[in-house]
Amino acid sequence: MKLTFLGANHEVTGSCTMLEAAGQRFLIDYGMEQGKNVYENQPLPVAPGEIDFVLITHAHIDHTGLLPLLAHNGFRGRIYATIPTVELCGIMLRDSAHIQEFEAEWKNRKGKRSGAEPVEPMYTIQDAEAACRLFLGVEYDKRIKLAPGIEARFVDVGHLLGSASIELWITEGSTTTKLVFSGDIGNLNQPIIKDPTYIQQADYVFMESTYGDRNHDPRPDYVAELAKILQRTFDRGGNVVVPSFAVGRTQEMLYFLREIKEKGLVKGHGNFPVYIDSPLATEATRIFRDTDPDCFDAQTRALLEKGIDPINVPGLRISVTSDDSRMINTDRTPKVILSASGMCEAGRIRHHLKHNLWRPECTILFVGFQAVGTLGRTLIEGTDLVKLFGEPIEVKAEICQLTGMSGHADKDGLLRWVNAFTEKPRRVFVIHGEDEVENRFVDTLTEQGFTACAPYNGAQWAIGAEGAVCLQEGTKVRVEQRTGEGANRAATVFQRLLSAGKRLLRVIEHNEGGANKDLAKFADQINALCDKWDR
């Protein structure tokens, strides 16, 4: 068999590995690169129509985001994933397609003035829907036959609802070789989902290394910590605004908030309202509720057996339309607002920041990683002033963070996972980590007696009865990037402008069916703004 490493090698997004074995050609993940891009991903070395099937570890876009493009370009095989992953991909790939369409539309409006050739979106809603029709949901822990000589099993890896490590048994001639692809390995003791499953045997392992050189901070009692934040904020008469990732983190927060209300941990404000103001988060929450309870951890299943919905918070209110969203801030009752995006770069959260950042009685609570250059990172690092929608906003609200919340295993967790094999694999291929992190994790594994390496994008390896042989080293081609503080600032600000444009398009769609008088006024305001800046 032959393996080609196509993406997320010496970087953390754009996961893709191609296998050619037992007369079949197939992919493990086909993700989109996001954020900082260091090394060029390799294009598929064959036509998409020549791919027989795809196996998906979990629903995050950096593992699935190019599936609509694959379908657009002629792929017609099956996409295998766990049942919850199939459901989540149904909403996340469509959301990604909306973004692709908007970005192409924006570029064409800009390019038209300079006579540039029109550009097409990377893929469309129709492409996303075509990809979704190719999915086939499989059960955890069930060994399935994919083709003659190829069998697979998906086991829960505790990263996200539906996430899996994939065990592969490949038989060529009289030799059967077992490969294990870790997927993103989860953190221990996350609410709702199970801890990672440990696998006992493999010949070759392909494992992620996101936190391969560091451990997480000690984990506080999140329920107690959150209750303290709510108590002091509500006592001041303020709101707690939570920028939250739509899938996974929002549902964790609902779990904590339900427990806080159930135990009466916030005194004098027991019936405080909780708002979800994110269409994607609302859809994801519905999927969590509809998922087979066997996918949940023991504590969550115990609640369900008692008739308790673990993410149903008394006083929960769902904001659907833009009018619903606006009404949240007209009500001065102290409340919790969960809204996307988690790093404050786009979405309805920016409106909630505009209405709450300047109020010293309010709190902005961060519950996830904030990348360098994002508004969320700026607020956490401390700033007195931000600009939202062209308006300067003083930062007077309390800014705080629940530390240690991560869906990824840290260094100790990764080592615990790989050391669970009863016999050391013949080789560990380290993937899905930043450049130096992968190298350091290879060194750590080597010190512990493993044979390990970290291939670059484009590397090819042959695996047979005699072992693994490198056929091609891969390329260390770095993506050209603008350098300098000014360039980075310009790129960040322009991304904010693009995000604002995406939001405007969504608001327009939400107003479909409104009164003609209101729609005409809205159109006039947009045209006036365009006239001002179309120069």
Predicted feature residues:
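A polyampholytic, Gly/Pro-enriched intrinsically disordered region
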Residues: 100-105, 292-305, 387, 469-495
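Short, compositionally biased "basic patch" segments
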Residues: 191-206, 293-300, 370-396
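Hard-cation-handling environments
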Residues: 229-374, 386-387, 422, 437-439, ...
